[in-house]
Amino acid sequence: MAIQIGINGFGRIGRVAFRIAISQPERFHLCGINVRNADLDYMVYMIRYDTIFGRFRGELGTYEKGITVNGKKIPVFSESDASCIPWESCGAEYIIDATGAF
């Protein structure tokens, strides 16, 4: 059974955690991402054209509440206060904090 994870922060470390989770679906299910001031199109761009890992080889897109990766919807939250992120709404069991704030 895959571990349900959420990612808080989507800079370099958050995107690395994203790629690891997406590349191992048997181990991880990415069920949410929190980005302060989220811009969904920019998130997709940053995933697609990574200067370290190269071009993302899957399907990427956006929908009204988040991004799609290989046909799977991942909700994106835009909370500045970590205590207000609704992780329970997506079923996250573990949160990767990639903000550097904690």
Description of each model-found segment:
Residues M1-F102:
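N-terminal Rossmann-like NAD(P) cofactor-binding subdomain of oxidoreductases
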